[in-house]
Design a protein with these regions (language model features):
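Short amphipathic coiled-coil heptad-repeat segments
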Residues: 6-54, 236-267
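Non-catalytic DNA-recognition/assembly elements of restriction-modification systems
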Residues: 1-8, 38, 55-76, 206, ...
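Short, ligand-facing micro-motifs at secondary-structure edges
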Residues: 97-110, 130-155, 171-175, 184-190, ...
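Short, flexible loop/hinge motifs at secondary-structure junctions
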Residues: 27, 33-36, 40-41, 47-59, ...
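Sequence-specific dsDNA recognition surfaces
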Residues: 68-81, 95-127, 144
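Short, solvent-exposed loop/turn positions at domain surfaces
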Residues: 78, 116, 193, 236-239
Length: 303
C-alpha cells in the first residue's frame, strides 16, 4: 500500500511534466508561422535588407508598380477535362499550388493538340496563381515552378501562368505575393460565383508590387531562404521531440507496472517490502486473523 501511494505520486508528477512539455512544444509551430510571416513582411517593406543597403554604393529604392508592367505574359490554361488513366501529358491539379510552393507530384493527365501543348506547357521560372478555389485562403496564392520534373507539364484552367521581364526575379515575386500585405490586397479582389471564390487575370495584373533593384531582390531571396531554412530545422526538431514526448506516457506507465519507478524507494525501505510492515506480511496477518476468527465460530457451534 505504501509503494502504491509512492507510485501514484510519481505518476502524477511525471505525467503532469509530460503534459506541460507537450503543451509548450505544440505552441511552437504557431510561433514559427508568425515568424515566417514576419520575415515575408520585412522582405517586401525593405526592413530585411535595411542594413544591407547602407553598404551599397548606389541608393536602393523600392518602386511601386502595377504587376502588369513587369509581365511578359499572363495566360489562362486549357479548360479540357483531365483524366486519371495516365493518357496524355501530365497536368497539375489546382491543389498543386500553395503559397510559395508547387507540388509537381500532384498531377493528372490531359490529351491535347501540339499547338495547345506549345502554348500551355510549363517551364522553370513560371509563376502560377490559383484563379478559383472553394477555400478563400487558397485563392490568389502564388507558387514558383522550380526544377521541372515532368516533360510537357501542363496546368489546369483554375490556375494562371505568369512570366516576367528581366526587371523582376520570379523568386522575389513569389515572396512578394506570399507576404501578408500582398495577400490582403489580393483578398480584396475575390468574388464568389456558384460557391467558388475567385479572382481574374485583370485582378492579378492590377496588383501593386514593391520592386527593388534586381541586386537587392537577389539579396532578399537569399535572406528569406536562409531564415526559412532555419525555421524548417527548428520545426523538424520540434516534431521529432513531440513524437518522443507522445511516447513518454506509455513508457512511464510501463515502468510503473514493472516497479522501476520505485526501485530506489524499495531499496531505502526494505522493511516495507519484506519485513513485518510489508504489504505481504500485512496480508498474511489478515489471513491469519480471519482463520482464527472462523475457527472460534466453528467451535462454538459444536458445543
Amino acid at each position: 500500500l505504501a509503494e502504491q501511494k509512492i507510485i501514484a505520486e510519481k505518476l502524477d508528477t511525471l505525467l503532469a511534466q509530460v503534459d506541460s512539455t507537450k503543451a509548450r512544444f505544440e505552441q511552437i509551430p504557431q510561433i514559427l508561422k508568425r515568424f515566417r510571416q514576419a520575415v515575408l513582411g520585412g522582405a517586401v517593406n525593405g526592413k530585411l535588407t535595411e542594413k544591407w543597403r547602407n553598404f551599397e554604393p548606389q541608393h536602393s529604392v523600392f518602386k511601386k508598380l502595377n504587376f502588369e508592367s513587369i509581365l511578359t505574359e499572363l495566360r489562362n490554361a486549357l479548360s479540357s477535362k483531365p483524366n486519371e488513366s495516365g493518357v496524355g501529358h501530365p497536368i497539375l491539379r489546382i491543389s498543386s499550388v500553395r503559397a510559395g510552393h508547387v507540388d509537381q507530384n500532384d498531377i493528372r493527365f490531359l490529351e491535347c493538340s501540339e499547338s495547345e501543348l506549345n502554348r500551355h506547357k510549363l517551364q522553370d521560372g513560371d509563376l502560377l496563381f490559383t484563379r478559383y478555389n472553394g477555400s478563400l485562403e487558397f485563392v490568389g496564392v502564388c507558387g514558383l515552378l522550380k526544377k521541372l520534373q515532368h516533360q510537357n507539364l501542363l496546368y489546369p484552367d483554375k490556375l494562371i501562368r505568369a512570366r516576367l521581364t528581366k526587371d523582376a526575379l520570379p523568386e522575389y515575386i513569389e515572396i512578394f505575393f506570399s507576404s501578408p500585405s500582398a495577400r490582403n490586397a489580393m483578398m480584396n479582389c475575390v468574388k464568389t460565383t456558384s460557391g467558388q471564390k475567385g479572382i481574374s487575370g485583370k485582378d492579378i495584373k492590377s496588383q501593386v508590387v514593391l520592386l527593388p533593384p534586381v541586386k537587392e531582390q537577389a539579396e532578399i531571396v537569399r535572406r528569406v531562404e536562409q531564415l526559412f531554412a532555419y525555421a524548417d530545422t527548428i520545426e523538424k526538431q520540434v516534431n521529432n521531440a513531440l513524437a518522443r514526448v507522445n511516447n513518454l506516457t506509455q513508457s512511464i506507465l510501463a515502468k510503473a507496472f514493472r516497479g522501476e519507478l520505485t526501485a530506489q524507494w524499495r531499496a531505502e525501505n526494505p522493511d516495507l517490502i519484506s519485513g513485518e510492515n510489508s504489504a505481504a506480511a500485512l496480508l498474511e496477518k489478515i489471513k491469519a486473523e480471519r482463520a482464527a476468527s472462523g475457527g472460534k465460530k466453528a467451535s462454538r457451534k459444536k458445543s
